[in-house]
Structure formats: structure tokens, C-alpha cells
Amino acid sequence: MNTKFILLAFTGILLLQTGIAHAQDRKIEQAIKHRKAAFTLMATYVNRMVQTVDGHRPFDAKLMAQDARTVELVSKLPWEGFVEGSERGDTRAKDDIWFEEDQFKRYANELQAKTAMVTFAAESGDLKRFKAAVGQMRDACNTCHKAFRKD
């Protein structure tokens, strides 16, 4: 009877651990999906602004201000998706993010500051100012991508 009880208890513990591990894997998958969705949404609006800056779309200050506000808002979202363990899985994030977390956070903050500048420039209606601000935002994106994204 003791052997059956021990075996049953051991089996229960294994099943519980398997369930916990599965829940942790789901949490990691959700974190990766969260940050990918935020980056995809941000890229959609950034690309429209870049097309405008590069002369492929006419400059519409009202539309660009709307797009810039969207990017500014969304630029705050992806960072909570970089949870421990999410370096594994379907991701282009380099492991360095978790080893150089302070630098990664500085780059995230820099991006957020630059997106605010783009919003301000777009709302001003000044194309020259808008182009300069978008250029600085692109530089912030590229700096972080070079350091922390697998291509």
C-alpha cells in the first residue's frame, strides 16, 4: 500500500510539474507574440512615414501626425514582452538582450523619445522638421536592431 501511495504521489507531482512547465512555455509564447505584434504594428506606421519622407507619398501633415501618435503609443508596448526565457522560440531577439539589459532599456527609451519628437514635428506641419525627426527615429531603430536583433 505504501508503494502504491508513493507511486501515485510521484505520478501526481510529475503531472503537476509538466502542467507548470507547459504553462510557462505558453507564457513565453504569449510574450513573444505580444512583442512581435507591437513591432509589426509599429513598422506599418513607420513605413508610411518613411515613404512620405522618401518622397513616395505626398506629405499630409494630419495623416502623418495621426501615424506618429500611433507609433508613439505603440513604442511603449513591446518591452514587456521580453520576459526571461523568451530568448528561446520563434524570435529574432539576440541573447544579448538579457545580458545587456541596461543598454537594451536605454535603446528602448531612446526610441520612445524619438517617436515623441516625430509626433511633435508632424503636428507642426513642417516637412523639413518631420523629415529630420523621422531620420532620428530610424537611426534609433537601426542602432537597436544592429545590437540586439538577428537578421
Model-identified regions with their sequence ranges:
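Short intrinsically disordered, low-complexity segments
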Residues: 13-15, 125
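Bacterial N-terminal signal peptides that target proteins for export
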Residues: 1-9
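Long, acidic, intrinsically disordered low-complexity segments
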Residues: 2-3, 22-24
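Cleavable N-terminal signal peptides
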Residues: 9-11, 21
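N-terminal signal peptide c-region/cleavage motif recognized by signal peptidases
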Residues: 16-20
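Sequence context surrounding c-type heme c attachment/ligation sites in exported
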Residues: 25, 29-61, 67-151
